[in-house]
Curated annotation (Swiss-Prot):
Its cofactor is Zn(2+). Zn(2+) binds at residues 108, 113, 136, 139. Gene3D superfamilies: Aspartate carbamoyltransferase regulatory subunit, C-terminal domain, Aspartate carbamoyltransferase regulatory subunit, N-terminal domain. Binds 1 zinc ion per subunit. It comes from Thermococcus kodakarensis (strain ATCC BAA-918 / JCM 12380 / KOD1) (Pyrococcus kodakaraensis (strain KOD1)). GO terms for cellular component: aspartate carbamoyltransferase complex. GO terms for molecular function: metal ion binding. This is Aspartate carbamoyltransferase regulatory chain. Pfam families: PyrI (PF01948), PyrI_C (PF02748). Belongs to the PyrI family. It comes from the Archaea. Involved in allosteric regulation of aspartate carbamoyltransferase. Contains catalytic and regulatory chains.
Length: 152
């Protein structure tokens, strides 16, 4: 293994890179990886990064992410990069993107919102990406970046 390699290479699975330092735990919670599932989970935290200063990396062996999971990651790590690995090689690499409309991922923090009492799927529209600000489709409550993680 090369001297500069600090985290093991995975044979198959997903690597989520450029997660802001300290947010790896929220990423694995979003993906439901806090419980043992038989796969290997590798985490590098507070790694030097030219892009972010410091970053976290999460490697999930034997698992590929759904579009919904990638969208959730984009909400807490908008500069993250997802790498798909097969036979120890990166076969696909893409940046996460926040969609214009977010459906069924977040819950509205407004206790009076119809989405918290009726059988309707929560929907949010992106008001701004930098800083991230979302607006509920039903009650028009605005959610700021710091409120998103607690409403996933």
């Amino acid at each position: 293994m090369p001297e500069n390699l600090k985290i093991e290479v995975i044979p198959e699975g997903t690597v989520i890179d450029h997660i802001p330092a300290g947010k790896w735990l929220k990423v694995i919670e979003i993906l439901g990886l806090t419980k043992p599932n038989g796969g290997t989970l590798l985490i590098a935290s507070n790694v030097p990064s030219k892009k972010l200063g410091r970053k976290d990396i999460v490697k999930v062996e034997g698992r590929y992410l759904s579009e919904e999971e990638v969208n959730k990651i984009a909400l807490i790590a908008p500069m993250a990069t997802v790498n798909i690995v097969k036979d120890y090689k990166i076969i696909e690499k893409f940046n996460v993107e926040i969609p214009d409309e977010i459906t069924g991922i977040l819950k509205c923090p407004n206790p009076n919102c119809v989405s918290n009492h009726e059988y309707v799927t929560p929907r949010f529209h992106v008001e701004s990406r930098e800083p991230l600000k979302l607006r509920c489709h039903y009650c028009e409550r605005t959610i700021n970046e710091d409120e998103i993680a607690q409403n996933l």
